[in-house]
Regions:
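Conserved TIR/SEFIR loop-to-helix hotspot centered on a Trp-containing motif
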Residues: 114
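Nucleotide and nucleotide-moiety/phosphate-recognizing core
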Residues: 1-111, 121-136, 142-153, 157, ...
Length: 201
């Protein structure tokens, strides 16, 4: 991923499925550790379909959004905040769970497809663009464990303790380079995320 001078104005949009009701499920992994990001003036606003807060990260004032919608309707919240604060897709960071990455792994990506992720599909549809930045938190795929269960059941299940620890570690590493991410220094952020090899390989 090449470096860029784009600074993010919305960081992070965290998408999951009724987080307060499903704190122990795999899908909720992207929310773990969000309390470590300063969130002054937190407010719930119906027109934003979620909790919104302003914060300063890495010298940049950003908007934090935690949608309260179903995960597959997350785009409604993202589009509402984007329109109200005049934020372009390239200035948005979405943190989400990633089946195609093993637990303990976090990666950055600019644009691209949804890879079957219903939350991303909704955001792309509502924004009319896929050019936002993604912070992908690995949760693994059921096939990694030779589990014969549907993906939908897997992401709603309780992760094993080992995976919980790996996911938590990946999120902490992501938070350690949040300044670089927000300021647009993606090359440096990726270097930090890649410092340690995938613990499951």
């Amino acid at each position: 991923m090449s470096n860029t001078s784009i600074r993010l104005k919305s960081c992070p949009v965290l998408i999951s499925n009724f987080i307060n009701k499903m704190k122990s499920c795999i899908m909720s992994c992207a929310f773990i550790g969000v309390s470590d990001i300063p969130q002054p003036d937190n407010q719930t606003d119906r027109k934003f379909f979620g909790d919104v807060a302003k914060a300063r990260i890495g010298g940049v004032e950003v908007i934090l959004l935690k949608p309260s919608t179903l995960m597959n309707l997350s785009g409604k919240a993202v589009a509402a905040v984007s329109a109200f604060y005049k934020i372009t897709p390239s200035e948005i960071l979405v943190a989400h769970d990633e089946l195609d990455l093993l637990p303990g792994t976090a990666r950055l990506k600019i644009g691209g497809g949804s890879a079957g992720h219903n939350g991303l599909k909704s955001i792309v549809s509502c924004l009319g663009s896929s050019d936002f930045v993604r912070l992908r938190i690995g949760i693994g795929h059921p096939r990694d464990r030779q589990l014969q269960i549907p993906v939908a059941d897997y992401v709603l299940s309780r992760p094993p303790k080992e995976d919980q620890e790996l996911i938590s570690s990946a999120i902490k590493k992501a938070l350690s380079c949040i300044d670089e991410i927000v300021e647009g220094d993606f090359s440096r952020a990726m270097s930090i995320l890649n410092e340690k090899n995938d613990p499951r390989k």
